[in-house]
Amino acid sequence: MLKILIPTVMLIPTAWLAPTKWLWPTTLLHSLLIALASLSWLKNASETGWSSLNPYMATDPLSTPLLILSCWLLPLMILASQPNHTAHEPINRQRMYISLLTSLQFFLILAFSATEMIMFYVMFEVTLIPTLILITRWGNQTERLNAGTYFLFYTLAGSLPLLVALLLLQNSNGSLSLLTLLHSTPPQLSTYAAKIWWTGCILAFLVKMPLYGVHLWLPKAHVEAPIAGSMILAAVLLKLGGYGMMRILMTLEPLTKELSYPFIILALWGVIMTGSICMRQTDLKSLIAYSSVSHMGLVVGGILIQTPWGFTGALILMIAHGLTSSALFCLANTNYERTHSRTMLLARGLQMALPLMTAWWFIASLANLALPPLPNLMGELMIVTSLFNWSWWTIALTGLGMLITAGYSLYMFLMTQRGPLPSHIMALEPSHTREHLLIALHLLPLLLLILKPELIWGWS
Protein backbone atom coordinates (compact mmCIF):
# COMPACT_ATOMS: atom_id res chain seq x y z
CA MET A 1 0.00 0.00 0.00
CA LEU A 2 2.79 2.42 0.93
CA LYS A 3 4.57 1.80 -2.38
CA ILE A 4 1.67 3.69 -4.00
CA LEU A 5 0.91 6.25 -1.28
CA ILE A 6 4.44 7.57 -0.71
CA PRO A 7 5.22 8.20 -4.43
CA THR A 8 1.79 9.87 -4.73
CA VAL A 9 2.62 12.26 -1.88
CA MET A 10 6.09 12.86 -3.36
CA LEU A 11 4.49 13.99 -6.62
CA ILE A 12 3.55 17.29 -4.91
CA PRO A 13 7.19 18.32 -4.15
CA THR A 14 8.10 17.07 -7.64
CA ALA A 15 5.55 19.47 -9.13
CA TRP A 16 6.91 22.41 -7.12
CA LEU A 17 10.64 21.66 -7.60
CA ALA A 18 10.76 20.55 -11.25
CA PRO A 19 12.20 23.12 -13.70
CA THR A 20 9.58 24.97 -15.74
CA LYS A 21 10.60 23.28 -18.98
CA TRP A 22 10.32 19.77 -17.52
CA LEU A 23 7.31 20.30 -15.24
CA TRP A 24 4.69 18.45 -17.30
CA PRO A 25 6.89 15.61 -18.68
CA THR A 26 8.33 14.88 -15.20
CA THR A 27 4.98 14.78 -13.41
CA LEU A 28 3.45 12.75 -16.24
CA LEU A 29 6.19 10.11 -16.07
CA HIS A 30 6.06 10.03 -12.26
CA SER A 31 2.27 9.53 -12.21
CA LEU A 32 2.45 6.91 -14.96
CA LEU A 33 4.92 4.88 -12.87
CA ILE A 34 2.51 5.07 -9.90
CA ALA A 35 -0.33 3.86 -12.16
CA LEU A 36 1.75 0.91 -13.39
CA ALA A 37 2.84 0.03 -9.83
CA SER A 38 -0.82 0.02 -8.73
CA LEU A 39 -1.53 -2.90 -11.09
CA SER A 40 0.20 -5.17 -8.57
CA TRP A 41 -2.95 -4.87 -6.41
CA LEU A 42 -4.75 -7.15 -8.88
CA LYS A 43 -2.74 -10.09 -7.57
CA ASN A 44 -4.98 -10.87 -4.60
CA ALA A 45 -4.28 -14.36 -3.26
CA SER A 46 -5.68 -14.16 0.29
CA GLU A 47 -8.45 -16.51 1.39
CA THR A 48 -10.52 -13.86 3.17
CA GLY A 49 -10.45 -11.56 0.17
CA TRP A 50 -8.72 -8.80 2.18
CA SER A 51 -5.07 -8.10 1.39
CA SER A 52 -2.41 -5.38 1.96
CA LEU A 53 -3.84 -5.23 5.48
CA ASN A 54 -2.72 -2.77 8.11
CA PRO A 55 -4.85 -1.30 10.93
CA TYR A 56 -6.25 1.48 8.74
CA MET A 57 -6.14 0.32 5.14
CA ALA A 58 -6.78 -2.80 3.09
CA THR A 59 -7.81 -3.86 -0.38
CA ASP A 60 -10.36 -6.46 -1.38
CA PRO A 61 -11.89 -7.50 -4.73
CA LEU A 62 -14.45 -4.66 -4.50
CA SER A 63 -12.04 -1.79 -3.86
CA THR A 64 -9.09 -2.97 -5.99
CA PRO A 65 -10.58 -2.13 -9.44
CA LEU A 66 -11.66 1.31 -8.19
CA LEU A 67 -8.24 1.98 -6.65
CA ILE A 68 -6.49 1.09 -9.90
CA LEU A 69 -8.93 3.25 -11.87
CA SER A 70 -8.10 6.21 -9.57
CA CYS A 71 -4.36 5.71 -10.08
CA TRP A 72 -4.78 5.20 -13.84
CA LEU A 73 -6.59 8.50 -14.24
CA LEU A 74 -3.93 10.84 -12.84
CA PRO A 75 -1.47 10.51 -15.78
CA LEU A 76 -4.41 10.82 -18.17
CA MET A 77 -5.57 14.04 -16.51
CA ILE A 78 -2.05 15.48 -16.69
CA LEU A 79 -1.82 14.42 -20.34
CA ALA A 80 -5.19 16.07 -21.13
CA SER A 81 -4.40 19.33 -19.32
CA GLN A 82 -0.95 20.04 -20.77
CA PRO A 83 -1.30 22.66 -23.48
CA ASN A 84 -4.78 24.12 -23.17
CA HIS A 85 -5.70 25.21 -19.66
CA THR A 86 -2.27 25.93 -18.45
CA ALA A 87 0.00 27.21 -21.24
CA HIS A 88 -1.01 30.85 -20.69
CA GLU A 89 -1.06 30.61 -16.87
CA PRO A 90 1.76 31.63 -14.49
CA ILE A 91 4.04 28.71 -13.65
CA ASN A 92 3.01 28.66 -9.97
CA ARG A 93 -0.62 28.18 -10.96
CA GLN A 94 0.39 25.26 -13.19
CA ARG A 95 2.22 23.71 -10.23
CA MET A 96 -0.83 24.32 -8.03
CA TYR A 97 -3.06 22.61 -10.62
CA ILE A 98 -0.91 19.45 -10.60
CA SER A 99 -0.74 19.51 -6.78
CA LEU A 100 -4.55 19.62 -6.59
CA LEU A 101 -4.89 16.65 -8.93
CA THR A 102 -2.31 14.72 -6.91
CA SER A 103 -3.98 15.49 -3.58
CA LEU A 104 -7.29 14.36 -5.07
CA GLN A 105 -5.75 11.01 -6.03
CA PHE A 106 -4.23 10.66 -2.54
CA PHE A 107 -7.61 11.22 -0.85
CA LEU A 108 -9.33 8.81 -3.26
CA ILE A 109 -6.81 6.05 -2.52
CA LEU A 110 -7.38 6.56 1.22
CA ALA A 111 -11.17 6.54 0.71
CA PHE A 112 -11.28 3.33 -1.32
CA SER A 113 -8.83 1.48 0.92
CA ALA A 114 -10.12 2.65 4.32
CA THR A 115 -11.10 -0.13 6.72
CA GLU A 116 -12.91 2.24 9.11
CA MET A 117 -16.19 3.82 8.07
CA ILE A 118 -15.33 7.13 9.76
CA MET A 119 -12.04 7.34 7.84
CA PHE A 120 -13.96 6.59 4.65
CA TYR A 121 -16.45 9.35 5.55
CA VAL A 122 -13.69 11.91 6.17
CA MET A 123 -11.96 11.09 2.88
CA PHE A 124 -15.32 11.08 1.09
CA GLU A 125 -15.80 14.67 2.30
CA VAL A 126 -12.22 15.86 1.77
CA THR A 127 -12.31 14.99 -1.96
CA LEU A 128 -14.84 17.84 -2.17
CA ILE A 129 -12.18 20.51 -1.52
CA PRO A 130 -9.75 19.95 -4.47
CA THR A 131 -12.68 19.33 -6.83
CA LEU A 132 -14.37 22.55 -5.72
CA ILE A 133 -11.15 24.55 -6.24
CA LEU A 134 -10.70 22.99 -9.70
CA ILE A 135 -14.24 23.95 -10.74
CA THR A 136 -14.30 27.46 -9.29
CA ARG A 137 -10.74 28.47 -10.19
CA TRP A 138 -10.07 26.74 -13.52
CA GLY A 139 -13.59 26.58 -14.96
CA ASN A 140 -14.36 28.35 -18.24
CA GLN A 141 -17.41 30.59 -17.72
CA THR A 142 -18.57 32.76 -14.84
CA GLU A 143 -21.31 30.18 -14.08
CA ARG A 144 -18.55 28.10 -12.48
CA LEU A 145 -19.21 29.82 -9.13
CA ASN A 146 -22.87 28.83 -9.32
CA ALA A 147 -21.84 25.26 -10.23
CA GLY A 148 -19.38 25.17 -7.33
CA THR A 149 -22.09 26.33 -4.90
CA TYR A 150 -24.50 23.65 -6.11
CA PHE A 151 -21.80 20.99 -5.83
CA LEU A 152 -20.80 22.07 -2.31
CA PHE A 153 -24.28 22.33 -0.82
CA TYR A 154 -25.74 19.20 -2.40
CA THR A 155 -22.78 17.13 -1.19
CA LEU A 156 -22.72 18.62 2.31
CA ALA A 157 -26.49 18.43 2.81
CA GLY A 158 -26.46 14.77 1.78
CA SER A 159 -23.42 13.88 3.90
CA LEU A 160 -24.32 15.30 7.30
CA PRO A 161 -27.09 12.73 8.00
CA LEU A 162 -24.53 10.00 7.16
CA LEU A 163 -22.20 11.25 9.90
CA VAL A 164 -25.01 11.15 12.47
CA ALA A 165 -26.05 7.67 11.28
CA LEU A 166 -22.46 6.38 11.53
CA LEU A 167 -22.01 7.79 15.04
CA LEU A 168 -25.25 6.05 16.05
CA LEU A 169 -23.93 2.77 14.65
CA GLN A 170 -20.60 3.29 16.45
CA ASN A 171 -22.51 3.90 19.69
CA SER A 172 -24.46 0.64 19.43
CA ASN A 173 -21.66 -1.57 18.04
CA GLY A 174 -18.49 -0.13 19.50
CA SER A 175 -16.69 -0.43 16.16
CA LEU A 176 -17.05 0.78 12.59
CA SER A 177 -14.41 -1.48 11.05
CA LEU A 178 -15.50 -2.89 7.68
CA LEU A 179 -13.96 -6.24 8.66
CA THR A 180 -16.39 -6.69 11.55
CA LEU A 181 -19.31 -4.59 10.31
CA LEU A 182 -20.69 -7.47 8.24
CA HIS A 183 -21.30 -9.52 11.38
CA SER A 184 -22.80 -6.72 13.48
CA THR A 185 -26.45 -5.95 14.12
CA PRO A 186 -28.07 -2.61 13.25
CA PRO A 187 -28.92 -0.36 16.22
CA GLN A 188 -32.20 -1.33 17.91
CA LEU A 189 -34.40 1.66 17.16
CA SER A 190 -38.13 2.24 16.98
CA THR A 191 -39.58 1.54 13.54
CA TYR A 192 -39.86 5.19 12.55
CA ALA A 193 -36.38 6.13 13.80
CA ALA A 194 -34.87 3.07 12.10
CA LYS A 195 -36.29 4.18 8.76
CA ILE A 196 -34.83 7.67 9.17
CA TRP A 197 -31.48 6.11 10.18
CA TRP A 198 -31.51 3.91 7.05
CA THR A 199 -32.24 6.92 4.83
CA GLY A 200 -29.46 8.90 6.53
CA CYS A 201 -26.98 6.10 5.84
CA ILE A 202 -27.84 5.92 2.16
CA LEU A 203 -28.64 9.55 1.26
CA ALA A 204 -25.05 10.82 0.96
CA PHE A 205 -24.20 8.08 -1.51
CA LEU A 206 -27.37 8.61 -3.55
CA VAL A 207 -26.52 12.33 -3.89
CA LYS A 208 -22.96 11.47 -4.91
CA MET A 209 -23.99 8.85 -7.49
CA PRO A 210 -26.26 10.87 -8.29
CA LEU A 211 -29.80 9.49 -8.11
CA TYR A 212 -32.35 11.16 -10.41
CA GLY A 213 -33.96 13.93 -8.35
CA VAL A 214 -30.77 14.92 -6.51
CA HIS A 215 -28.70 15.11 -9.69
CA LEU A 216 -28.94 18.83 -10.47
CA TRP A 217 -25.40 19.59 -9.28
CA LEU A 218 -23.79 17.12 -11.71
CA PRO A 219 -24.48 18.67 -15.16
CA LYS A 220 -23.53 22.12 -13.82
CA ALA A 221 -20.29 20.85 -12.27
CA HIS A 222 -19.34 18.87 -15.40
CA VAL A 223 -20.04 21.66 -17.84
CA GLU A 224 -18.10 24.28 -15.88
CA ALA A 225 -15.16 22.12 -14.76
CA PRO A 226 -11.85 22.07 -16.67
CA ILE A 227 -11.06 18.87 -18.55
CA ALA A 228 -9.24 17.21 -15.62
CA GLY A 229 -12.14 18.08 -13.30
CA SER A 230 -14.69 16.53 -15.66
CA MET A 231 -12.56 13.40 -16.09
CA ILE A 232 -12.02 12.68 -12.40
CA LEU A 233 -15.63 13.59 -11.55
CA ALA A 234 -17.11 11.22 -14.14
CA ALA A 235 -14.58 8.43 -13.75
CA VAL A 236 -13.97 8.16 -10.00
CA LEU A 237 -15.86 10.61 -7.78
CA LEU A 238 -19.30 9.30 -8.80
CA LYS A 239 -18.03 5.78 -8.02
CA LEU A 240 -17.39 6.78 -4.40
CA GLY A 241 -21.18 6.80 -3.98
CA GLY A 242 -21.60 3.31 -5.43
CA TYR A 243 -18.68 1.94 -3.41
CA GLY A 244 -20.00 3.44 -0.17
CA MET A 245 -23.48 2.02 -0.82
CA MET A 246 -22.11 -1.47 -1.42
CA ARG A 247 -20.12 -1.29 1.81
CA ILE A 248 -22.85 0.05 4.08
CA LEU A 249 -25.85 -1.88 2.71
CA MET A 250 -24.42 -5.04 4.23
CA THR A 251 -25.10 -3.70 7.72
CA LEU A 252 -28.56 -2.29 6.99
CA GLU A 253 -30.38 -5.62 6.80
CA PRO A 254 -33.28 -6.27 7.19
CA LEU A 255 -34.42 -2.65 6.64
CA THR A 256 -33.29 -2.54 2.99
CA LYS A 257 -35.84 -5.15 1.94
CA GLU A 258 -38.76 -2.86 2.70
CA LEU A 259 -37.27 0.60 2.16
CA SER A 260 -35.34 0.26 -1.09
CA TYR A 261 -38.32 -0.12 -3.47
CA PRO A 262 -39.07 3.58 -4.04
CA PHE A 263 -35.36 4.26 -4.65
CA ILE A 264 -35.09 1.43 -7.20
CA ILE A 265 -38.14 2.72 -9.09
CA LEU A 266 -36.84 6.31 -8.95
CA ALA A 267 -33.43 5.18 -10.25
CA LEU A 268 -34.96 3.28 -13.18
CA TRP A 269 -37.36 6.14 -13.95
CA GLY A 270 -34.29 8.42 -13.90
CA VAL A 271 -32.62 6.25 -16.56
CA ILE A 272 -35.50 7.03 -18.93
CA MET A 273 -35.89 10.69 -17.96
CA THR A 274 -32.20 11.65 -18.16
CA GLY A 275 -31.90 9.68 -21.42
CA SER A 276 -34.78 11.71 -22.81
CA ILE A 277 -33.09 14.93 -21.64
CA CYS A 278 -29.94 13.81 -23.52
CA MET A 279 -31.95 13.53 -26.74
CA ARG A 280 -32.81 17.25 -26.49
CA GLN A 281 -29.38 18.60 -25.47
CA THR A 282 -27.50 21.11 -27.59
CA ASP A 283 -24.46 21.32 -25.32
CA LEU A 284 -22.04 18.43 -25.83
CA LYS A 285 -20.58 18.32 -22.29
CA SER A 286 -24.07 18.57 -20.80
CA LEU A 287 -25.20 15.59 -22.89
CA ILE A 288 -22.30 13.44 -21.63
CA ALA A 289 -23.02 14.59 -18.03
CA TYR A 290 -26.69 13.59 -18.24
CA SER A 291 -25.69 10.23 -19.76
CA SER A 292 -23.63 9.67 -16.57
CA VAL A 293 -26.77 10.18 -14.46
CA SER A 294 -28.58 7.66 -16.65
CA HIS A 295 -25.89 4.98 -16.27
CA MET A 296 -25.56 5.58 -12.54
CA GLY A 297 -29.34 5.04 -12.21
CA LEU A 298 -28.81 1.47 -13.41
CA VAL A 299 -25.95 1.06 -10.92
CA VAL A 300 -28.19 2.26 -8.04
CA GLY A 301 -30.82 -0.30 -9.08
CA GLY A 302 -28.23 -3.08 -9.24
CA ILE A 303 -26.82 -2.27 -5.80
CA LEU A 304 -30.17 -1.87 -4.01
CA ILE A 305 -31.45 -5.19 -5.35
CA GLN A 306 -28.63 -6.81 -3.31
CA THR A 307 -28.06 -9.98 -5.30
CA PRO A 308 -24.56 -11.22 -6.24
CA TRP A 309 -25.36 -10.56 -9.92
CA GLY A 310 -26.60 -7.06 -9.12
CA PHE A 311 -23.42 -6.20 -7.18
CA THR A 312 -21.13 -7.66 -9.85
CA GLY A 313 -23.01 -5.89 -12.65
CA ALA A 314 -22.90 -2.60 -10.73
CA LEU A 315 -19.12 -2.81 -10.21
CA ILE A 316 -18.45 -3.79 -13.85
CA LEU A 317 -20.67 -0.96 -15.11
CA MET A 318 -18.97 1.54 -12.76
CA ILE A 319 -15.50 0.67 -14.07
CA ALA A 320 -16.60 0.55 -17.72
CA HIS A 321 -18.56 3.80 -17.42
CA GLY A 322 -15.59 5.48 -15.72
CA LEU A 323 -13.33 4.79 -18.69
CA THR A 324 -16.00 5.51 -21.33
CA SER A 325 -17.33 8.81 -19.98
CA SER A 326 -13.82 10.08 -19.25
CA ALA A 327 -12.86 9.28 -22.88
CA LEU A 328 -15.98 11.10 -24.13
CA PHE A 329 -15.10 14.20 -22.08
CA CYS A 330 -11.57 14.14 -23.55
CA LEU A 331 -13.01 13.90 -27.07
CA ALA A 332 -15.44 16.74 -26.36
CA ASN A 333 -12.49 18.77 -25.09
CA THR A 334 -10.45 18.18 -28.28
CA ASN A 335 -13.43 19.54 -30.25
CA TYR A 336 -13.79 22.50 -27.89
CA GLU A 337 -10.10 23.43 -28.18
CA ARG A 338 -10.47 23.73 -31.95
CA THR A 339 -13.95 25.19 -32.41
CA HIS A 340 -14.23 27.08 -29.06
CA SER A 341 -17.86 26.02 -28.83
CA ARG A 342 -19.65 23.24 -27.00
CA THR A 343 -22.83 23.74 -29.04
CA MET A 344 -23.18 20.75 -31.34
CA LEU A 345 -24.89 22.70 -34.13
CA LEU A 346 -21.87 25.01 -34.45
CA ALA A 347 -19.31 22.19 -34.65
CA ARG A 348 -20.68 19.60 -37.05
CA GLY A 349 -19.09 17.51 -39.77
CA LEU A 350 -15.72 17.13 -38.06
CA GLN A 351 -15.16 13.80 -39.82
CA MET A 352 -14.01 15.79 -42.85
CA ALA A 353 -11.41 17.70 -40.83
CA LEU A 354 -10.29 15.11 -38.24
CA PRO A 355 -10.94 11.62 -39.67
CA LEU A 356 -8.88 9.68 -37.10
CA MET A 357 -10.67 11.42 -34.22
CA THR A 358 -13.92 10.17 -35.76
CA ALA A 359 -12.72 6.59 -35.28
CA TRP A 360 -12.17 7.29 -31.56
CA TRP A 361 -15.58 9.00 -31.34
CA PHE A 362 -17.16 5.94 -32.95
CA ILE A 363 -15.58 3.47 -30.50
CA ALA A 364 -16.42 5.66 -27.48
CA SER A 365 -20.04 6.14 -28.62
CA LEU A 366 -20.47 2.40 -29.15
CA ALA A 367 -19.00 1.75 -25.70
CA ASN A 368 -21.48 4.27 -24.25
CA LEU A 369 -24.46 2.49 -25.82
CA ALA A 370 -23.14 -0.89 -24.53
CA LEU A 371 -22.13 -2.77 -27.65
CA PRO A 372 -21.32 -6.45 -27.16
CA PRO A 373 -18.79 -7.73 -26.08
CA LEU A 374 -17.69 -4.64 -24.14
CA PRO A 375 -17.80 -4.67 -20.30
CA ASN A 376 -20.51 -1.95 -20.45
CA LEU A 377 -22.92 -4.49 -21.91
CA MET A 378 -21.87 -7.18 -19.44
CA GLY A 379 -22.56 -4.87 -16.50
CA GLU A 380 -25.90 -3.66 -17.88
CA LEU A 381 -27.09 -7.18 -18.69
CA MET A 382 -26.25 -8.47 -15.21
CA ILE A 383 -28.12 -5.57 -13.60
CA VAL A 384 -31.11 -5.91 -15.95
CA THR A 385 -31.25 -9.68 -15.34
CA SER A 386 -31.13 -9.34 -11.55
CA LEU A 387 -33.84 -6.64 -11.67
CA PHE A 388 -35.99 -8.80 -13.98
CA ASN A 389 -35.55 -11.70 -11.58
CA TRP A 390 -36.93 -9.50 -8.78
CA SER A 391 -39.87 -8.12 -10.77
CA TRP A 392 -40.51 -8.63 -14.45
CA TRP A 393 -42.18 -5.19 -14.67
CA THR A 394 -38.72 -3.62 -14.51
CA ILE A 395 -38.00 -4.84 -18.06
CA ALA A 396 -40.26 -2.05 -19.37
CA LEU A 397 -38.14 0.62 -17.68
CA THR A 398 -34.71 -0.93 -18.31
CA GLY A 399 -35.54 -1.91 -21.91
CA LEU A 400 -36.79 1.56 -22.76
CA GLY A 401 -33.80 3.09 -20.97
CA MET A 402 -31.32 1.03 -23.00
CA LEU A 403 -33.15 1.96 -26.22
CA ILE A 404 -32.95 5.67 -25.39
CA THR A 405 -29.26 5.26 -24.45
CA ALA A 406 -28.55 3.84 -27.92
CA GLY A 407 -30.55 6.72 -29.42
CA TYR A 408 -28.67 9.57 -27.74
CA SER A 409 -25.25 7.92 -28.22
CA LEU A 410 -25.84 7.74 -31.97
CA TYR A 411 -27.32 11.26 -31.93
CA MET A 412 -24.16 12.55 -30.23
CA PHE A 413 -21.91 10.79 -32.78
CA LEU A 414 -23.89 11.94 -35.83
CA MET A 415 -24.25 15.53 -34.62
CA THR A 416 -20.53 15.98 -34.01
CA GLN A 417 -19.06 13.99 -36.90
CA ARG A 418 -21.49 13.96 -39.83
CA GLY A 419 -23.18 16.69 -41.84
CA PRO A 420 -21.73 19.75 -43.58
CA LEU A 421 -18.66 21.40 -42.08
CA PRO A 422 -19.70 24.94 -41.00
CA SER A 423 -17.97 27.72 -42.93
CA HIS A 424 -16.52 29.34 -39.80
CA ILE A 425 -14.35 26.31 -38.93
CA MET A 426 -12.63 25.61 -42.22
CA ALA A 427 -9.08 26.02 -40.87
CA LEU A 428 -8.69 23.55 -38.00
CA GLU A 429 -5.55 22.52 -36.18
CA PRO A 430 -4.80 18.83 -36.92
CA SER A 431 -5.11 16.26 -34.13
CA HIS A 432 -2.00 15.61 -32.04
CA THR A 433 -0.32 12.35 -31.10
CA ARG A 434 -0.89 13.35 -27.44
CA GLU A 435 -4.65 13.32 -27.98
CA HIS A 436 -4.62 9.94 -29.72
CA LEU A 437 -2.49 8.50 -26.91
CA LEU A 438 -4.89 9.95 -24.33
CA ILE A 439 -7.97 8.34 -25.90
CA ALA A 440 -6.11 5.07 -26.55
CA LEU A 441 -5.18 4.85 -22.85
CA HIS A 442 -8.88 5.16 -22.01
CA LEU A 443 -10.28 2.73 -24.55
CA LEU A 444 -7.54 0.06 -24.62
CA PRO A 445 -8.09 -0.99 -20.97
CA LEU A 446 -11.82 -1.12 -21.74
CA LEU A 447 -11.26 -3.39 -24.75
CA LEU A 448 -8.70 -5.55 -22.92
CA LEU A 449 -11.08 -6.13 -20.00
CA ILE A 450 -13.18 -8.19 -22.43
CA LEU A 451 -10.40 -10.81 -22.30
CA LYS A 452 -10.22 -11.02 -18.49
CA PRO A 453 -13.45 -9.72 -16.95
CA GLU A 454 -12.87 -11.49 -13.61
CA LEU A 455 -10.53 -8.62 -12.66
CA ILE A 456 -13.57 -6.38 -12.15
CA TRP A 457 -16.10 -8.96 -10.92
CA GLY A 458 -15.81 -7.96 -7.28
CA TRP A 459 -16.87 -10.43 -4.61
CA SER A 460 -18.74 -13.08 -6.54
From Swiss-Prot:
Family: Belongs to the complex I subunit 4 family.
Any one of the GO CC terms: mitochondrial membrane
Protein name: NADH-ubiquinone oxidoreductase chain 4
Catalytic function, reaction form: a ubiquinone + NADH + 5 H(+)(in) = a ubiquinol + NAD(+) + 4 H(+)(out)
Keyword check for Translocase: yes
Example GO biological process: ATP synthesis coupled electron transport
Keywords assigned by UniProt, alphabetized: Electron transport, Membrane, Mitochondrion, NAD, Respiratory chain, Translocase, Transmembrane, Transmembrane helix, Transport, Ubiquinone
One Gene Ontology MF term: NADH dehydrogenase (ubiquinone) activity
Chain ranges passing through the membrane: 22-42, 61-81, 97-114, 118-140, 149-169, 196-216, 226-246, 259-279, 286-305, 309-331, 352-372, 395-415, 437-457
The keyword NAD appears for this protein: yes
Lipid bilayer topology: Multi-pass membrane protein
Pfam families, per database record: Oxidored_q5_N, Proton_antipo_M
This enzyme's EC code(s): 7.1.1.2
Source organism: Tetraodon nigroviridis
Compartments (UniProt record): Mitochondrion membrane
Task of the protein: Core subunit of the mitochondrial membrane respiratory chain NADH dehydrogenase (Complex I) that is believed to belong to the minimal assembly required for catalysis. Complex I functions in the transfer of electrons from NADH to the respiratory chain. The immediate electron acceptor for the enzyme is believed to be ubiquinone.
InterPro entries, per database record: NADH4_N, NADH_Q_OxRdtase_chainM/4, NADH_UbQ_OxRdtase, ND/Mrp_TM
